[in-house]
Structure formats: structure tokens, C-alpha cells
Amino acid sequence: MSVVITIDGPSGSGKGTICRLIAEASGFELLDSGALYRLTALATVEQGANSADEQQVAGIAASLDIKFIPQEGSTQVMLAGKDVTKAIRAEEIGMLASTVAAYPAVRQALLDRQRAFLTAKGLVADGRDMGTVVFPAAPLKIFLTASAQERANRRVKQLEQAGVASINYEQILSDIEKRDEQDRNRATAPLLPADDAVMLDSTALSIDEVKQQILGLAKARQLF
């Protein structure tokens, strides 16, 4: 039987990094569901489509030509044969991704696509509704959080490491708080922990401490 570990949580909580580390440690496949919504947002912009037209955006989501290529310490994301790993991480694409993710037709278009990532090898799934909607029967569900201030600090460090010259902490914090509000209050698949999820606050924890806690939970459940 295929095993899936879901890790849900708000933007900037460290889901992506932790999921990659858990996948490496377990030998499981990796699903970055947030990237699918960011890819949909980017493709919508690049095609000059109307982002307010739910059916048009859903059509784009259904026909995405995407590929995830594992790299040392990261994952390369390809859209129609083009490397968009950095492009999908732009703040404006993240905000638009949150908007299009609220469309039921878009979520439905991507649902089967996400479930298809689960193979006999096992899967670590990163997102906002992995444990509640996409993989509700997962034997281990994590809801990873951190304070908005800590998540803004992490984003600032990411941008500094990427060589971004002009960084506005207050704007980044405001964007995170707006996105949290959007994600929590959308009508379809709002950002909420599954009833049986393990709540894990990473505000005062290192990446390795979070990783070890999750690996401990997985091993206690004999998932690998």
C-alpha cells in the first residue's frame, strides 16, 4: 500500500524545505502542490488571460505542461520546457496563486493531477489542503505553522541570499498577512488543519529540529 505524509500550513512556514528533507530521508516522492498553483498563476499572466475568469484559468490549470526535476538541495520547476523555478516565487505570482486557488474549478482541475503523484514509492505532499482534501486518508498529517513575523524574517533572508537589493520587511509582512487572510477565508478548501493533524509550530525551532520531530512521528507509525 502506498504511504503519504501530508504537510500543510501557511505561506513561509517552511513546508517546502521540510518536505524536501523528509522526502530525501524516506526515499519518498515529493509533491509541491503550491508550485502547481503558482504555475497556474504564472501561465495565466504569460498567456495574457483574464485572472478573474474562473473557467479560463481552470482550462490553463488542466493543460499545464510541467515537470519537476530534483536537484541537489532544491527542485527545478519547468513550464512548457522553460525553467521557471525563480519566476514562480515572485511575490506577485504568490498573491495571484492564492487568488486562483480559491476557484473551485481550478482546484478540481488540479486534484487528480496531485493524486497521481502518489506511487508505490510513497509521497510527501506539501500544500494547504493535502490532509483535508487531496489525501484525507493519509496516515500522518502535519500542520506546520510559524508566526507571521518569523515567516517575514525568513522571506527577507531568502531574498538577501538571492541577491535582491531592495527589500521592504513591512511590505513582506503585510503580504503574508493578506495571503493568510485569503487562504483562511476562501469558500473552497480553506487553510485549516485536518482533525487528526499533528500541530507543529516552527517559530522557535531550527529546520533540523522540525525534520527530526516529523521523522520521529513517521517512524513511530512505522511508515518507513
Swiss-Prot record:
GO terms for cellular component: cytosol. The keyword Kinase applies. Pfam families: Cytidylate_kin. GO terms for molecular function: ATP binding; CMP kinase activity; dCMP kinase activity. Its EC number is 2.7.4.25. The keyword Transmembrane helix does not apply. Its main location: cytoplasm. GO terms for biological process: nucleobase-containing small molecule interconversion; pyrimidine nucleotide metabolic process. It is found in: Cytoplasm. Coiled coil: none annotated. It catalyses: CMP + ATP = CDP + ADP; dCMP + ATP = dCDP + ADP. NCBIfam families: cmk. Belongs to the cytidylate kinase family. Type 1 subfamily. The gene is cmk. Transmembrane segments: none annotated. This is Cytidylate kinase. It comes from Saccharophagus degradans (strain 2-40 / ATCC 43961 / DSM 17024). ATP binds at residues 9-17. InterPro entries: Cytidylate_kin (IPR003136), Cytidylate_kinase_dom (IPR011994), P-loop_NTPase (IPR027417). Keywords: ATP-binding, Cytoplasm, Kinase, Nucleotide-binding, Transferase. It is an enzyme of class 2 (transferase). Signal peptide: none annotated.
